[in-house]
Amino acid sequence: MNRRTFLAAGAVSAIGCAAFRRGTGAREAVARPARFPNVLLRTHEGRTVRFYDDLIRGRIVTVNFMYARCQNICPGMTSNLAMVQRALGKRVGRDIFMYSITLKPEEDTPAVLRSYAAAHGVKPGWLFLTGEPDDVETLRRRLGFVDPDPAVDADTSQHIGVVLYGNDALDRWAACPALSDPDEIAKYILWMEGRRRPA
């Protein structure tokens, strides 16, 4: 386990997940929509989208960062999130949407991301995203995927292995290590609907 995975794991509760909601007195993980930059991105399917308007607004979503040539945490994270996608079944792409954003947009073209997604058995409803480097960096920082140590933060190979998930319509957001038990991650994503509580 690298330092970032350890920090992420230590920052969340015993089951590996932590929720934040506006107005509860808890630290706000992400506010809407001001903290969601509406930058242009390209999907692994070749479409151009706006981050907030097209991907986040009114939806239940997951967001994580990765890059295709990563040999550290990324392959395990992607494989684990593929199990989350399977656990959520046909809801992914219908009313739950998954997004993985490359940390190396200068390398990860839509074609590269398409190959990466195919190699990991990614199904419809999960988009891999690239864009202009400055826009991707803005997203990373505004979404909170930042290490407090500037030297560590500058090292892409030590990026934070966390998945952010939430419901924009309810302004309910949480995060957990992307290597948490996939069934637990799926359960807490479903909790974001507001009609249920975790068992």
Where are the regions a protein language model picked out?
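N-proximal helix/coil linker or "cap" segments that precede and/or mark the start of modular domains
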Residues: 17-38
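Conserved helix-turn-beta segment immediately C-terminal to the redox Cys motif
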Residues: 78-98
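N-terminal export signals
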Residues: 5-21
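Short, internal strand/loop/helix patches
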Residues: 115-160
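Thiol-/selenol-based redox modules, centered on thioredoxin-like
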Residues: 153-199
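A short beta-strand-turn-helix
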Residues: 40-60
